[in-house]
């Protein structure tokens, strides 16, 4: 069918219908072809035949609504606020409008056959955002055609992902039966999902190795102090992980939310109405305030987990966290309205999520967000890429759930020595036994994402292929259990769910494999899901269908014989059903009782009354078979969903095993060693940080064809502060980051790149490496630097690790030196944290002369004949030159500039008598 012409489009090449006369006189049109006309001739022609400018609206500036036409002020014709009368619509569109009224702020995707369709304003929105064709559909006799746009149901995840990225929420109206029930003309449909950024469970819409967090946050004033109490609950709907924490300062909440990178954050309007701390940082969705009330939240929690009371959660019933948990679950229930419903609405279950776990603020190594960026733990600082980060360097996981697990470990390193040592022991066993490691990794390589697969099953959103993947994963568990027979694996709680494998899971996997065919279709409502021999009624229906198919084959032979048309074929078309096809030449010989159905260029198609009757019976059988197969599948999916919590426990064990075997592979192939973690009970050694020949875990892998120079570090026993000096580009910043990354690796239980190491557990890790303007908040580079420094000095303890680079360089020389000097003394004498201070201020080397826990180190360089060579070796002693001019030369600064800089430097050194010399400590820092 030809497309309708665009009414806004016209031909660019139409001949002008304008008269060629001017004032009754004929104009000269014979002056030559247009390409030969001069500019003067064209101007002359324009003056003789002036063109009148056509305008569609007043070009003047609009200052008042009265200047606008009614059409511009009113809602667009197809806006959902201006929908036509429901009674005038066709039945399908009538249902669509009813659902749209219930979901006015969401794009409504309505399943019709193989497509999800949108109508009215949503169709226009869909067409514009996804750049798909906007068409129309008959809306009723009084309505006429209405806008329509659609997406294929099998590709809906991809399109929904695009809509979510563009900030929209989606309501999914799907078919609730394979064929219309008896007495109904329309297939039953209903809202099955409300998709928002934080409630996604569909595989194609999620990042495999990253959590997708939905968070709820509440704040309230503390009547006993000036602080604001806050509670943050976070849930990954796809994996079931559920954590909650509380605090007292909004800055701490801000840090947690930056680290979390939640896909969606909800709150009640009362909590955020007068708050500014989150603006410009995150978008917060306001949710029903009553859902966050203590009474309703308590009821929501009890109903969801089938509890008589909430005391068993371990959360005080009067705490703010009860409200954040209840509000979050209420939001989840709203976005998954029909969780667990099968076609006949016989079963309803709750989506499977873990019991909320209390996360204590001091439970792990505290790393602020500036430090995370500086150390490039999960993404690079410059462009936010994965490649070049610590996670990129050490992630050798083979499964999606293992990838998420190692990311969580890096984001929250441990401070409890037993847990760290448990991980170390398992890695050690897997390093020593390469065959054990390789066998385990071979099993894991093809393991599906059991965490998210079981989550979809629990939400009754899993497809047939999802259940097959679950069964394949479960079938690998006994083999993994076989390899976990060493006592070291039994000492930790990680692998309890596999060592004590639930036999019900094995039986469930067997049931899945026995009932669902090996390669099932994506569609669940078109049959072809269930093996023969599973259900006697299904087998009987299939036998009946086979009989009809046999009749079709015999009928083709019989009609060919009776008509004497040898090339006759009995065929099927999805739109036309069954028909008899003959060539054009033979069509004159067809029997009289044949009825012409369709004419093609080289073929004629016919039907017979008997064939049409048989076709109706076949279609009815197919519909019954498809419906029964879907019902059987739903029952099986419910069984899997009921076991989703057990499957998830096994999945968490698999994810830990994947991480540990990956870290063992990393250690074995990169010559890593097991660091000795110093027990906190040994107060004389607990702060020690001693690493021999340590290497940067990321840079070492990037320097494929070059040798990485290893370096030592000794802090915490006698020395608390190292003053590190050396020229630009010599490796000071790399050394600082190396120390920080090795501390993190040690506290997640990993082995590290070094010759030997004794590492005390740090409670906090701070870095200040480089700074940039914060234009959004009007802060200069120097102010940003001072704010970061103040945060460190106000929060660090003697058990912290502090790494500072170039403090004080953003102001005048003497101001900067004074600040750097004072900060160094404060760290060494007041806080006594393990600290490294990299600087170009060589005067700071004097501090070690009167503060005994300060020591000078330098990055060694070779300088001969105005040529500078970086050796990247850190040694004891202070540097006395910065070699900044030589570094500029190496960077490609023009020779004239470099030579002139040398002359200027000589004059400055000759004339500068303001040498700084301090021989006694600053009294205020004693």
UniProtKB/Swiss-Prot annotation:
Gene Ontology cellular-component annotations: cytosol
Compositionally biased residues, Polar residues: 18-44, 57-67
One GO process term, biological-process aspect: mismatch repair
UniProt cross-references to SUPFAM superfamilies, sorted A to Z: DNA repair protein MutS, domain I, DNA repair protein MutS, domain II, DNA repair protein MutS, domain III, P-loop containing nucleoside triphosphate hydrolases
Location of region: Disordered: 1-67
Top-rank taxon, per record: Bacteria
Positions bound to ATP: 726-733
GO molecular function: ATP binding; ATP-dependent DNA damage sensor activity; damaged DNA binding; mismatched DNA binding
InterPro entries: DNA_mismatch_repair_MutS, DNA_mismatch_repair_MutS-lik_N, DNA_mismatch_repair_MutS/MSH, DNA_mismatch_repair_MutS_C, DNA_mismatch_repair_MutS_clamp, DNA_mismatch_repair_MutS_core, DNA_mismatch_repair_MutS_N, DNA_mismatch_repair_MutS_sf
Keywords of the record: ATP-binding, DNA damage, DNA repair, DNA-binding, Nucleotide-binding
Pfam family membership, one: MutS_I
HAMAP family xrefs: MutS (MF_00096)
Family membership noted in the UniProt record: Belongs to the DNA mismatch repair MutS family.
Protein task: This protein is involved in the repair of mismatches in DNA. It is possible that it carries out the mismatch recognition step. This protein has a weak ATPase activity.
Designated name of the protein: DNA mismatch repair protein MutS
Organism of this sequence: Prochlorococcus marinus (strain NATL1A)
Encoding gene (name): mutS
